Amino acid sequence: MELEEELSPADAVLLMSSVPERISDLVYGLDEAKLRYRHGPAFPTLGGLIAHLLESGTRVDALLRRAHLEGLDTADLSGVIDPLQMQELDRPLQEAVDDFARVRRRTVDLLHGWGKNEWERMVSDPHAGEVTLLDICRRVSRHEMAHIVQIRNLTALLPEPEDLGPPTDGQKMPTPAPDIG
C-alpha cells in the first residue's frame, strides 16, 4: 500500500507512534519455529523481517533525535532506513519489541514538541540530496507500514501445526483392517 497523500507532521507522528503496538499485536504468541518461517528461498525469515523493522526503526529514531538535539545535518538515510543486510533476531522477541516501543515513545514525545521550523529543517543525504525532517518521517512511515503489511501477510501464511503422532523409529505403523461388514 502506497501512501498517496502527503502526510502532515501530526499524521506522520501518529503513524510512527502506532508501529510498536501494531508489531506487538501481529507477533504475539509467535514461537521460534514460526519466527524461522521463510516463504521462499529469496525471502527473509519472519524473524529476520521483524528484526529488520525493529532495528531500522531504532536507527531512524536515533537519527531524528541526533538531528534535533545535536544539529546533525548529514545522514545516509537509505542505510539507516533500509540497510542492505537483514539480521535475524538476536534476543527474545518480546524483549526486542518492548525495547523498540520504549525508544519510539521517547522519539514521538520529542516530535510532538517540534514546530514548523524544526519539521522543515534540512538534512543532507548523499543519495537523496536535501530532505526535511518531515520528509524523513514520511519515508519512515511508508517503510514501516509496508513491512507491517508484509509481517501480517506472512503470519497469515504460516503453516498450521500438524500432529504427526508418536515417533515410529522408521517402521511402518500397523493399520487396522478395514471394516467391510
PLM features per residue range, with description:
Residues M1-E2, V13-L14, L35-V80, M122-G181:
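Short, contiguous alpha-helical
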Residues A12-L15, P20, M86-L93, R105, ...:
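Small-residue-biased structural context
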